[in-house]
C-alpha cells in the first residue's frame, strides 16, 4: 500500500482504475470511506486516488493545530509520490477548501469539484460540524451523528448502508485530537479575497439540505470563482455519499468538457 511523506508525516493513499487521475479529498474527521460510492461511479475510465488526511485513518496523526495550507502540501506530496503530472481534484467540506488552496499554490490541478464547501470558514455551522463527531467505539453514537450528515429520513431509511458506514467509521475516522485539528482548519479557513486567482475550471455541487455549510455559501463560491459553475442537489452535507449517481454524472460531464486539454 503506497505511502507518501510530507516532512515527518506519512500519508496513506490508494488508487484504482486507469486513465486520467481523479484525486479525492475528504471532509473533516471522516475516512476515505465517504468516497466509496463515487469511486464506483468513476473507476474504470478514470484512475481514482483516495488518501487519508493527516490525523485520519492509516495516515500519521501529529498533534494539531492543522491548517489548510499544510493539508494542501500533504496533497502535493501524495500526487508527487504517485507521479501524477495532472489530477482532477474532488473535495468535500474541508477537502474542498484543501482543493481550493492547492489550486492556488501548486500546479497539478486540472479541474476542481467542490462539494458542500465554502471559501469562508466562518460560514460553516460550527455546532453542526462538531455534531458529526462521535466516539469510534460507540456504534449507536456514530449512527446518531450521521443524522446531521444526510438529509432527513435517509439514515432511518437505509439501515444496512448505515451499518456499513458505522463499521467503516470505527476503523477510519479521526481520533478526537484529529477531529479537533481538522475542525479548526475548517472554521479558520478564508480564501474570499483570493478566489480571483483560481482560474481552474470549477464545479461547485451542494446539497440543498446541507446542515453544515449553507447552500447559499456554495452558490456564492461558484459566483466568485472566475470559472465556477453551481449545481444544487436534493441531499445533505455528504452529497456524494447520498446521491453518488447524480454527483458522478456531473463530474463525468465536467471531465468530458475539460479533461482532454489538460493531459
Where are these regions (language model features)?
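Catalytic active-site module of serine/aspartate enzymes centered on a nucleophile-bearing elbow/loop
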Residues: 227-263
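Gly/Ala-rich beta-loop-alpha elbow adjacent to hydrolase catalytic centers
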Residues: 91, 95, 99
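Short beta-strand/loop motif that positions the catalytic acidic residue
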Residues: 198, 204-206, 210
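Active-site loop/oxyanion-hole signature of alpha/beta-hydrolase fold enzymes
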Residues: 50-90
Amino acid at each position: 500500500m503506497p505511502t507518501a511523506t510530507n516532512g515527518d508525516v506519512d500519508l496513506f493513499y490508494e488508487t484504482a482504475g486507469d486513465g486520467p487521475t481523479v484525486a479525492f479529498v475528504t471532509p473533516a474527521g471522516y475516512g476515505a470511506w465517504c468516497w466509496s460510492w463515487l469511486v464506483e461511479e468513476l473507476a474504470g475510465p478514470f484512475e481514482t486516488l483516495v488518501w487519508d488526511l493527516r490525523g485520519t485513518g492509516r495516515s500519521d496523526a501529529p498533534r494539531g493545530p492543522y491548517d489548510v495550507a499544510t493539508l494542501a502540501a500533504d496533497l502535493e506530496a501524495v500526487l508527487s509520490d504517485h507521479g501524477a503530472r495532472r489530477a482532477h481534484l474532488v473535495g468535500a467540506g474541508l477537502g474542498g477548501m484543501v482543493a481550493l488552496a492547492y489550486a492556488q499554490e501548486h500546479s497539478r490541478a486540472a479541474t476542481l469539484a467542490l462539494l458542500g464547501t465554502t471559501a469562508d470558514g466562518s460560514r460553516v455551522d460550527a455546532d453542526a460540524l462538531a455534531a458529526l463527531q462521535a466516539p469510534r467505539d460507540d456504534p449507536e453514537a456514530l449512527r446518531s451523528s450521521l443524522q446531521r450528515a444526510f438529509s432527513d429520513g435517509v439514515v432511518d431509511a437505509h439501515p444496512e448502508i448505515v451499518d456499513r458506514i458505522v463499521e467503516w467509521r470505527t476503523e477510519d475516522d479521526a481520533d478526537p485530537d484529529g477531529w479537533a485539528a481538522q475542525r479548526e482548519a475548517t472554521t479558520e479557513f478564508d480564501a474570499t479575497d483570493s478566489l480571483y486567482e483560481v482560474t481552474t475550471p470549477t464545479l461547485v455541487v451542494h446539497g440543498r439540505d446541507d446542515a453544515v455549510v449553507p447552500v447559499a455559501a456554495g452558490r456564492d463560491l461558484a459566483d466568485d470563482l472566475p470559472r465556477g459553475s453551481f449545481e444544487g442537489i436534493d441531499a445533505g452535507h455528504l452529497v456524494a455519499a447520498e446521491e453518488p449517481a447524480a454527483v458522478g454524472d456531473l463530474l463525468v460531464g465536467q471531465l468530458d468538457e475539460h479533461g482532454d486539454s489538460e493531459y
